[in-house]
């Protein structure tokens, strides 16, 4: 599933073609994805200008001049890609639509934005912009890890007395929004903390050290265009390449990359998900 860096990468890639631009026509090619599309979705999108775009957790939000906000979740295999030149040249150079191209946005600058989702775990909805943050999917989210509300005192407070493993705590979207399995594994490695350790038993100094480490891991991944393991593509169709720099994720049995450590990467299962870590240098 695309995590925060992948969704941020896609959103940034869509902005030049969509932000400030009118959706000339929206084509919806099936009745649903994870859940049914909103009523009259084509009518409510066509002719509307995208005022601004932003990301919240793993959701892309596009505010429209109608007072509604388009919410998009990529699910497990969803992609949003741009074809055509948004400056107006080669506006007919669009590839033929594919089987799983479920929603197509024809922008009035000549760009075409296509939502492709083979597994159909993605989702779209239209929300009232003024009340978007109180929507049931967004209201339960914790602070953004790249935002000002994510700070040391927040994490110390969230971990206090918590008996769950730190890996599970960091994946709790009510504590931090947008973190996923890959980047939690990578952040815990950089911090030297075992994913098995109870969150509430980690010293305050080690908890506070996690905040800048989490930020840096996410920033590094965004700079690399995200991680492409199976389905993920950037908005221009290119692969991300942060996966080539993973320290632990997907490296079971391989040597630890920490200087001076002679351990190997271990994989365990926690809450149904694989955790990768070095048992020698992560404590």
UniProtKB/Swiss-Prot annotation:
Q: Keyword set for this entry? A: DNA damage, DNA repair, DNA-binding, Glycosidase, Hydrolase, Lyase, Metal-binding, Multifunctional enzyme, Zinc, Zinc-finger
Where is the catalytic site? Answer: 2 (schiff-base intermediate with dna), 3 (proton donor), 58 (proton donor), 273 (proton donor)
The reactions it catalyses are: Hydrolysis of DNA containing ring-opened 7-methylguanine residues, releasing 2,6-diamino-4-hydroxy-5-(N-methyl)formamidopyrimidine; 2'-deoxyribonucleotide-(2'-deoxyribose 5'-phosphate)-2'-deoxyribonucleotide-DNA = a 3'-end 2'-deoxyribonucleotide-(2,3-dehydro-2,3-deoxyribose 5'-phosphate)-DNA + a 5'-end 5'-phospho-2'-deoxyribonucleoside-DNA + H(+)
Q: Where are the zinc fingers (FPG-type)?
A: 247-283
Keyword Chloroplast on entry: no
Q: Does the keyword Signal apply?
A: no
Which positions are annotated as binding DNA?
100, 119, 162
Q: Which GO terms describe its molecular function?
A: 8-oxo-7,8-dihydroguanine DNA N-glycosylase activity; class I DNA-(apurinic or apyrimidinic site) endonuclease activity; damaged DNA binding; zinc ion binding
Q: Which Gene3D superfamilies match?
A: 1.10.8.50, MutM-like, N-terminal
Official protein name in the record? Formamidopyrimidine-DNA glycosylase
Q: Which organism is it from?
A: Ruegeria sp. (strain TM1040)
